[in-house]
C-alpha cells in the first residue's frame, strides 16, 4: 500500500435544537458570503428553509435550489459559476447525500479553472477549496 494522508474537514451536524444554537457561528466563521445549496420542496414544506434563512439573515445568502438526486453536472456547473461570480466564502448544504455531494464538488470547483466534471472523474486536481 502506498503511503498517504487523508483529511476530511467536512462538518456534518445532527441533533435536536442544534441549528438555532450553532448554525450562525458555524457558517460565519468562514465569512459572510454564503452559497446555500438545497434540494426540492421538502425544505420549504418542513419550515427548515425559513429557519435557516432567518438565522443567517445578516449574511449574504446566494441560493442554489433544486439539487437533484444524483446531481446533474449542469447543477454543479451552475454552483461553480455562483461561487466564482459571487466570491463565495462558504458553501452550506442543507439536505441529504446528493445535496452534500454536490456542495463538496462546488466548494472544490471555486478554485478550479476547468470543468468541474474533471474533479468528479478524478482528472482534475485542485489544491484549494472552500
Where are these regions (language model features)?
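Glycine/threonine-rich beta-strand-loop-alpha-helix active-site module
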Residues: 74-130
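ATP/NTP phosphate-donor binding region
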Residues: 1-90
Amino acid at each position: 500500500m502506498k503511503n498517504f494522508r487523508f483529511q476530511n474537514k467536512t462538518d456534518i451536524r445532527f441533533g435536536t435544537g442544534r441549528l438555532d444554537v450553532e448554525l450562525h457561528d458555524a457558517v460565519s466563521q468562514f465569512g459572510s458570503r454564503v452559497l446555500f445549496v438545497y434540494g426540492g420542496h421538502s425544505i420549504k414544506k418542513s419550515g427548515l428553509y425559513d429557519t435557516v434563512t432567518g438565522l443567517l439573515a445578516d449574511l449574504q445568502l446566494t441560493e442554489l435550489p433544486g439539487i437533484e438526486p444524483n446531481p446533474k453536472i449542469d447543477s454543479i456547473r451552475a454552483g461553480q459559476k455562483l461561487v466564482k461570480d459571487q466570491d463565495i466564502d462558504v458553501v452550506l448544504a442543507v439536505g441529504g447525500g446528493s445535496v452534500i455531494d454536490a456542495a463538496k464538488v462546488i466548494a472544490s470547483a471555486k478554485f478550479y479553472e476547468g470543468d468541474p466534471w474533471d474533479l468528479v472523474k478524478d482528472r482534475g486536481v485542485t489544491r484549494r477549496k472552500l
